[in-house]
Curated annotation (Swiss-Prot):
Family listed: Belongs to the beta-defensin family.
Record-linked Pfam families: Defensin_beta
Tissue localization of expression: Expressed in both adult and neonate brain, and very weakly in kidneys, epididymis, and testis.
SUPFAM superfamilies, sorted: Defensin-like
Disulfide bonds: C37-C66, C44-C59, C49-C67
One Gene Ontology term, aspect cellular component: extracellular region
Secreted among keywords: yes
Cellular localization per UniProt: Secreted
Protein name as annotated: Beta-defensin 10
Length: 73
């Protein structure tokens, strides 16, 4: 019984451990989102885009939004 509990504990600890590769992957995705925003002429802004711009996408999972200026003729 003790061996079974020990094995179960080891498996739980092993599978609950987050590897650094997962953190690096998340960082690369966020960097790609930020690069895409700047590539299409956007800028990152908190909460709501200003009046002279429109929402394009998100820069990060937090409340940063990618906004793009509206050209006025």
């Amino acid at each position: 019984m003790r061996t079974l509990c020990s094995l179960l504990l080891i498996c739980c600890l092993l599978f609950s451990y987050t590897t650094p590769a997962v953190g690096d992957l998340k960082h690369l995705i966020l960097k790609a989102q930020l690069t895409r925003c700047y590539k299409f002429g956007g800028f990152c802004h908190y909460n709501i885009c200003p009046g002279n711009s429109r929402f394009m996408s998100n820069c990060h999972p937090e409340n940063l939004r990618c906004c793009k200026n509206i050209k006025q003729f």
